[in-house]
């Protein structure tokens, strides 16, 4: 029973780390990356669809993304969706392809993005600690129900703490890498 709780806690902590990585990937760096446009929704025949369902996003060079729209009639809608997104991008249209030059980040903007990334990392750490709290309370419930001994509780608390430390270290490594990437000129 305790093993199940520990495995569940480890799996949930891993998901917290993955979610934190995904949130950090959405933060724009100076380099072009297709995942930058993942959050953009396009009005496709009355329904909102993710950009990657109506167009192919690729990298032209280190500072330019290219978006090839599958349906030529959708070029205007895709361009509008990119312009109205809060990413501050200005696409240039050439037939069914949009080229999106990424402006260089100012020092002030970089610092703002670092604040956002640090906040995401802290949210990830909080989520991991919440999983730890849940796992420990589950184990203590087992102890109250006389399904395990006090020694089992101590051992499992130590194990959960090891998982927590490892996953928080993982989040910190991701944060450090993202900060380094943001500060590159």
Swiss-Prot record:
Its main location: cytoplasm. Keywords: Cytoplasm, Protein biosynthesis. Pfam families: RRF. Disulfide bonds: none annotated. One of its GO terms (cellular component) is cytosol. One of its GO terms (molecular function) is ribosomal large subunit binding. It is found in: Cytoplasm. SUPFAM superfamilies: Ribosome recycling factor, RRF (SSF55194). GO terms for biological process: cytoplasmic translational termination. Belongs to the RRF family. Responsible for the release of ribosomes from messenger RNA at the termination of protein biosynthesis. May increase the efficiency of translation by recycling ribosomes from one round of translation to another. PANTHER family: MITOCHONDRIAL RIBOSOME RECYCLING FACTOR PSEUDO 1, RIBOSOME RECYCLING FACTOR. This is Ribosome-recycling factor. It comes from Shewanella denitrificans (strain OS217 / ATCC BAA-1090 / DSM 15013). The gene is frr.
């Amino acid at each position: 029973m305790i093993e199940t709780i520990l495995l569940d806690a480890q799996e949930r902590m891993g998901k917290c780390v993955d979610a934190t990585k995904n949130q950090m990937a959405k933060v724009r760096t100076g380099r072009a990356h297709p995942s930058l446009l993942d959050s953009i929704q396009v009005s496709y025949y009355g329904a909102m669809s993710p950009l990657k369902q109506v167009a192919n996003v690729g990298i032209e060079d280190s500072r330019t993304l290219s978006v090839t729209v599958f349906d030529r009639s959708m070029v205007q809608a895709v361009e509008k969706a990119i312009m109205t997104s809060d990413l501050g991008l200005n696409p240039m249209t050439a037939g069914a392809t949009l080229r999106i030059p990424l402006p260089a980040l100012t020092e002030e903007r970089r610092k703002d993005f670092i604040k956002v990334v640090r906040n995401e990392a802290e949210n990830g750490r909080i989520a991991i600690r919440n999983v730890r709290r849940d796992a420990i309370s589950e184990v203590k419930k087992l102890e109250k129900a006389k399904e395990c001994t006090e020694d089992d509780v101590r051992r499992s608390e130590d194990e959960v703490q090891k998982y927590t430390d490892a996953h928080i270290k993982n989040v910190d490594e991701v944060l450090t890498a993202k900060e380094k990437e943001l500060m590159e000129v």
